[in-house]
Amino acid sequence: SQIYVYYKVTAANRAAALAGAKALIARAAADVGVDGALSCRAEDPLTIMEAYGSVHDAPAFMAWLDTAVSSCGLRSLIEGDRHTEHFVPCA
């Protein structure tokens, strides 16, 4: 399955949030073996999305991710909530 997480940041926090998100993605690969990618919304570069593929145990990964986001300091750079979507193959 795939996990997508998106959130808004302020212009002042954008560079730090991108650095934190890149570190989080690297940590996901190292700690739990899940590769990720980072994107920004085309029409709104203050909206950031983390995409994680090949997640075999989504509940466990999302619990790990929630803890990791807090411990790496990324949560404090986000405006509002992190929105998480879980997709599974349908065909």
Q: Model-derived features: where do they sit?
A:
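Conserved short beta-strand edge segments in small beta-sheet-based binding/regulatory domains
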Residues: S71-F87
